């Protein structure tokens, strides 16, 4: 009995203790929440001093304005003005590309691999000037940087490590931010070689923060690519070449903190200290390879020269701010795709929830800019989805929803040790989310100006800084440019633009609205680099549990399965090169458009393994180079048509009844010149428009001429007014058709039947020789391109143009008239002929011909490393690929 009584007492006491702990925890949590939610009128930045708020001037603020690059004042060449916002040292780098300086050693005498405890911490302006003087006397020095991106919207450089033969220097770029230009001359000196590892981001970060431009660089990562090393990471080189192990998790530490821990100092020194020794070892290997390769005496095949060329190509990169049509639009589209369309269950998110996702993403973007915080520190993607689905109705519920979701997903493990979710921005501005959920701010255009005024207005709750001040000026411009098309309507087309203004309007309308290449990395499970790709592809792997995140800035993943093949094994070095968001022709970086070197009318009919996830033949061009390339392609199409005897346009279209039992809807007999066979959709529409509008008033000879043009399309039979109405819509997209119907002077008596054509015909206009270049670009923009073009076979990447868009031969059997438009039928017959007569080798030769046409027309000077005319394009499909034939069969 005594034992039972004691047990009861113990259980009772334990229960009371547990209840007390739970009560105290809940009390503290509620007290903290009340404290945080009750101080909504006060921003957390009034009590928290962020290191970057000590900067007196920033080159890249958080506004929507374009980043302005350094402009060099050269009196001798003032008349020859360089392109606005171009690379200030492009001339010097081009000289190095043509005449690389590699005849020197990275080491002087014997080198000890032991790293001493001695180093120099540079934190004053006088020390920085002394360092600049020391570096100016060096022939080579090593560089590395440490970044901070979590508590900053654009990120900033927190530390620069520089190593010479004698000493290691750690430069406190937070303390010296405003005077870092002191180092600009030594970094831009073409006579001094700067050694980096994986400098693609370091180069643009130095431009962003300090207007420091690297000229003459040797990148040990590029040397690894040329040598086809199994891994290209610095940790791998440190271990295999120097026998030094490093903890790469330290890269994610908060490099803003001062003083740095001993472990962080040693890590920072290690990255730069051994780079000179590693560079020397790799150049020795490159020279040995060049000696062994006796079959290629030409210097272009010299491995050391190739490594130098790739390194200096990296120097030409230019920093650009990511731009969007509207704040947060890219993030909201990605979230909706991943959590709705990407998983097929459309019941999870209603239309109202989708709109709330857009509002929250726009609000998150603006709050990140105002407070200089990364968007993930403001509000996580998972929290946005949770709020949009649950739509809590009180501030307490909103707070709990965010806290529980972030705790469950642990989306930011690096934050959990310091600050718990919800993060300070949410706690200070919880009322904004409450109003958005209640739909008190119904429109995005209303929401953002109100939030901006509340935060930065005359009586704003948030402090003004060098990072957010420009938002007050540029934000109205951003919103007005977003709304301009709706307000102006058709009036814009009535205005008389000068050539320059018209071109600027065209560029604004059709150029890419955000960087195409994100240069995210995918590694195989053995650590070898497979490819560079965009963020969406990384998310595809991560969401399916096929990969793990190994680096955050820039993002990199490692596959958890064995991929099918390696790029270097297949001779596809192109896919393991970083790509710059510039025109490959002239280097224009302010605007660019995607361009298909091999026209879609051919490529869409290629076998799957010769086109899927292949971006070798998709490049970026500015408007001027795009026009040159397109004109050359149109001329060459005519040569192809003559050579193969297959006309570009359908000679005539048969009734579906007549077509039954025939093997082809296109007449085989050709005229003397096959390029004149058939009717161009543009000429067809022009003739139909003239006949409908002025047919009764025009001279009989002209009327007959136009009738013959339309009759040729319909096979020579008599025409009805209904035929003319249908011809007027040939080759137009559904949007263009509706737009045409609204124009004055055009009425359709058979509008119901004509409108039905929108769903019956979907053709590719990509191949048409349109006089209006805008038509061409409309088709170009309808293509969603995989910007990675990776060498892996897994993942869905980005969508190719579907067959109904590209294939003019895709017809609906219900049509009373079968319509073959554009160059689709021509392309299909060409590819069928090549496969029938020459097999896949014929298709590859055909592709090489088109690449040569492109090179001869544009003379590209900025093509990515590894791009070549003789690229094979072949690939295999792995187990998880949506293009795997066995997988396709199993799903059908």
Curated annotation (Swiss-Prot):
Listed GO CC annotations: cytoplasm; cytosol
Cellular localisation: Cytoplasm, Cytosol
Keyword annotations of the record: Cytoplasm
Domain of life: Eukaryota
Domain HRDC intervals: 350-436
Molecular functions (GO terms): 3'-5'-RNA exonuclease activity; nucleic acid binding; nucleotide binding
Disordered: region residues: 785-811
An annotated GO BP: exonucleolytic trimming to generate mature 3'-end of 5.8S rRNA from tricistronic rRNA transcript (SSU-rRNA, 5.8S rRNA, LSU-rRNA)
InterPro entries: 3'-5'_exonuclease_dom, HRDC-like_sf, HRDC_dom, HRDC_dom_sf, RNaseH-like_sf, RNaseH_sf, Rrp6-like, Rrp6p-like_exo
3'-5' exonuclease domain: residues covered: 119-287
Main location: cytoplasm
Protein name: Protein RRP6-like 3
